[in-house]
Amino acid sequence: MATMEDMNNMSGEITLPGFRFHPTEEELLDFYLKNMVVGKKLRYDVIGFLNIYQHDPWDLPGLAKVGEREWYFFVPRDKKHGSGGRPNRTTEKGFWKATGSDRKIVTLSDPKRIIGLRKTLVFYQGRAPRGCKTDWVMNEYRLPDNCKLPKEIVLCKIYRKATSLKVLEQRAALEEEREMKQMVGSPASPSSTDTMSFSSPQEEQNMPLPLLQHVLKKESETEDMVVPKQEKITNQLVLKDTNKSTCGTSLQMPFGKEKLPDLQLPMLSDWTQDTFWAQLNSPWLQNFTPTNILNFY
């Protein structure tokens, strides 16, 4: 059991400025995991024991003992019932999916000596087999199959994969394209003239009587609204033309004489007003009869 002095030393070591925890894969397997499996207590408890599948990956950094960009946990292997002993890696909002086959980890001093296996998994939001891939990655380290030590505990390293600028640009382009499709696909708000209903005779026959009466009433109201509007526009155009003609002339009528009297012209049937016929209608010619002619001679 660790003494109070050991705990103080451990706390002081971890909180020292500049302290970073970046173990190699060989150190994780041959030192931390192996000592945890055999039950050997370490002086510095830098890796905590946690069932990470009860939490989503974005919650794990706050549950780790140390780490800034990488977080480490001892995790119990939870077997899924009736599936050949495959571990259950499902969380509340997603699941961890393995990518590729396991990779063998060897020591630097003896490349032929296998000290463990590494499995890489990626977190997907949703439910299997469908889901949305995220940038959360996990490296699961376990002891080799030929090891006689218990294998109910694994060591997991959680981190976020660095996203390149090209991938970010592709995501932004896809998001923009999806928004444009939604804008094009969404129906535009109809105007007042677009809402006018014109039903075919066949549709009117198939339409119930109350509904048909309602539609005809709506069409009649729409026509009554449109006709006065057209008459108003016509009157405005006539008034505008009148104003233009008035403003275009330079003649001004005297005050009180805005309206000229009508020009008096002789009627078409009044031939006495013509100068030629007035000469023929002289009094002398009126007395010019056959009797007067004989008396004249």
UniProtKB/Swiss-Prot annotation:
Keyword Signal included in the entry's annotation: no
Protein's cellular compartments: Nucleus
Stored InterPro entries: NAC-dom, NAC_dom_sf
Keywords linked to the UniProt accession: DNA-binding, Nucleus, Stress response, Transcription, Transcription regulation
UniProt tissue specificity: Widely expressed.
GO CC annotation terms, alphabetical: nucleus
GO function terms (MF aspect): DNA binding
Primary location group: nucleus
Superkingdom of origin organism: Eukaryota
Pfam families assigned: NAM
DNA-binding region as annotated in the record: 115-167
Domain called NAC: residue spans: 15-161
Induction: Induced by abscisic acid (ABA) and cycloheximide. Induced by tunicamycin, azetidine-2-carboxylate (AZC) and osmotic stress.
Start-end of Low complexity biased regions: 189-201
Region spans: Disordered: 178-204
Gene Ontology biological process terms, A to Z: regulation of DNA-templated transcription
Domain remarks in the Swiss-Prot or TrEMBL record: The NAC domain includes a DNA binding domain and a dimerization domain.
Function: Involved in response to abiotic stresses and promotes cell death and hypersensitive-like responses. May act downstream of NRP-A and NRP-B in the endoplasmic reticulum (ER) stress and osmotic stress response that mediates cell death.
PANTHER family listed in its UniProt record: NAC DOMAIN-CONTAINING PROTEIN (PTHR31744:SF79), PROTEIN CUP-SHAPED COTYLEDON 2-RELATED (PTHR31744)
Protein known as: NAC domain-containing protein 6
